[in-house]
Amino acid sequence: MGINLQKGQRISLEKEAGRGLSRVVMGLGWGMKQVQSKGFLGFGGGSRQEAVGLAASCLLFDAGGNLVDTVWFRQLESRCGSIRHSGDDRSGGGEAGADNERIAIDLARVPASVQTLIFTVNSFSGESFAGIPNAFCRLVDDASGCDVARFDLSLEGSSHTGLVT
């Protein structure tokens, strides 16, 4: 099990996962929101699941802090081909603990001019992360399938609708 990241915490991939790390995946997962319905005249009420739209992105920066490229649901691959987005999931749900969106990074193919990768998560539906069940993002060693780091958006995201991880 990897590091459970706290808000504002940074890690070095080389230090945490070792030099053998060649491919990583940023996974984003979340559940559908439970909404209570009142019914008609107090009858027929109950709960239903409501879709929630989260989105993962990756920003590539050079040593000077200049934005070099972006990968997100409208640009599924970096120009160099080293980073690929799985596509947009507009509803959430699915198997508990599974990734709804994935960004795969082939570290060996990332250009030397790229010094920093920043992952962002935002809520397109406007829900705060605290109101989205089981929301998380994680960094996975693609070879072993083990988490390198994990961030619990439902707990750490509080009232925010966007985070940079």
Task: State where each predicted segment sits.
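Intrinsic-disorder/low-complexity signal
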Residues: 1-165
